[in-house]
Amino acid sequence: MAETVVLSKILHIRETEKKHAQKAYQQSIDLFEKTATQLYELLKKKEMAEEVYETALTESTTLDKLKEQFTYIEHLNNHIMHLQEEVQKARFDMEAKQSKLTDAHVEMKKYEKIIETRKKDEAAANRKKEKATMDEVSIYQFLNHKNR
């Protein structure tokens, strides 16, 4: 019984670790989604800017407007490259935290299984002991009854 109490305390610690890992994983998912959404919005802006630039090329537009639009597109490209790196980092972090969460879950399940097995063994030992006691009582009663 004392063994299962100790194991239950360890299980509680593992459950706490799992909750922390789950929270960290959720935060990493949120960060990834936020960064990916920013990248998506920036890609949409770039696409629209390129359409405006292409339209400006076909129409009679001043050279300054074309340079300005081209510079804007280059600025967007630089920002997109930076955000792509951020998305990759966020994805890597998210995958690492998912792995930690999986490991924490497996550890927790191990202790649950060990506790379950120990309790079953304990119950079987108690039943065996109870049966032996009942057999002993029956023999004692039989012998007492026979001696009368």
Cite the ranges covered by each PLM segment.
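Charge-rich amphipathic alpha-helical interaction elements
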Residues: 1-148
